[in-house]
């Protein structure tokens, strides 16, 4: 599977959804991992740490969404990401659908498969 890790862009969210150790595990199991440039920097992980374990760095969030079969995030997509989610993608993140009708409708329109915990 092609896994994409976009940099979190929601206000005050500094975590990254996959550590270099997690990326290493996925790569060892035959998956391809793409990390958006500087996605891990606010969590203390450099692009080089991801590259050392076999992950590939992409320059933009659009690049990550365009290539990934599965997107892994910490927080739900925000409005500027809605149109990046594709019908054939899995999106794994924390969704808060009950309090965000716009997000709920956008994800329903995307036709993607959503994996979440609330």
Where are these regions (language model features)?
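An N-terminal-biased, well-structured beta-alpha scaffold segment characteristic
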Residues: 2-112
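Conserved small/polar residues in nucleotide/adenosyl-binding loops
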Residues: 116-118
């Amino acid at each position: 599977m092609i896994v994409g890790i976009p940099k979190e862009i929601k206000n005050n969210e500094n975590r990254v959804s996959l550590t270099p150790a997690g990326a290493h595990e996925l790569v060892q199991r035959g998956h391809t991992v793409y990390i958006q440039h500087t996605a891990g920097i606010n969590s203390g992980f450099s692009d080089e740490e991801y590259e050392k374990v076999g992950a590939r760095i992409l320059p933009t969030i659009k690049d990550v969404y365009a290539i990934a079969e599965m997107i892994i995030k910490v927080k739900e997509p925000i409005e500027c990401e809605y149109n990046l989610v594709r019908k054939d993608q899995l999106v794994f993140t924390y969704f808060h659908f009950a309090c965000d009708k716009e997000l709920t409708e956008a994800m329903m329109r995307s036709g993607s498969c959503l994996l979440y915990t609330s």
